[in-house]
Regions:
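Acidic, Ser/Pro/Thr-rich low-complexity regulatory regions
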Residues: 1-49
Length: 49
């Protein structure tokens, strides 16, 4: 998979994560955990040459 595709996938996960928190499907702790993991992945992808 290309970096562009992987980044798009991460942004979709982050958007879904936010919506799940808003609708009460997940707790704030679960939301924060997913956000932390996905932003770490995004950082690694952006720092890869």
């Amino acid at each position: 998979m290309t970096n562009i595709f992987l980044c798009a996938q991460i942004y979709q996960i982050l958007a879904l994560n936010d919506e799940m928190l808003k609708s009460g499907c997940i707790t704030r702790d679960e939301h924060d955990f997913v956000r932390h993991v996905q932003t770490d992945k995004l950082t690694r992808l952006h720092s890869t040459p």
